[in-house]
């Protein structure tokens, strides 16, 4: 029996999934769930063996959606009992300063991913929920979190640090984190073969272009900055992370950030 990994990407109102052959890396089956929790019929799509199966019905939450996904495997193939699933991988946008590499899904790591939703409010919550649901549906299969931000974990301080009060930055874990790291890691790993040059010493500028887009030089997204004047580069999400009220924002932006005027 082939060994496979079921990859889950849980969004705020959607789920994408793919069953991947562990040895060849080939996608065997895939699909998506859309419009979760919306006041209209949701949409399911499951593809296997060249055939596409679709269904529309209300989808109240991620648990309902994932239960239906597992039902599609048994109804349209490959059957779960024959699929050889040895692990379930969950893509997570933000691992913060906690996760430098993939981590086993446990009660502790689920709670940590939820806590990091302050840095990725649209992503981490649904991703943690997807892992919780899949643990309950496939309790005997190991579940793994894979973090987009891990690819950028070792950024040098000069690339990851803001011109921001250090106390505020440390308290609220504000730094440049990077996004789409799994995509950047894959692209940068195959480029040497494509161009016929050794990976060591090969300089790359990597672009991820999808529903979101980013570039990895050091990188250019996720707690990244818009150009400002008085305070230098300031990224608007830092305001939401700190939940500052307007007077505090004005003080921070005008007096506490960036280079200070002297003399």
Language-model region placement:
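Short glycine-rich, Thr/Ser-proximal phosphate-binding strand/loop in the N-terminal lobe
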Residues: 5, 14-60
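Conserved active-site "lid/cap" helical segment
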Residues: 39-84, 130, 137
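Short beta-strand-loop/turn "lid" adjacent to the catalytic site in phosphate-handling enzymes
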Residues: 73-123, 144, 151-159
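Phosphate-binding/catalytic loop of phosphoryl-transfer enzymes
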Residues: 124-125, 131-218, 223
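Short linear motifs in low-complexity or flexible loops
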Residues: 231, 240, 246-247, 252-256, ...
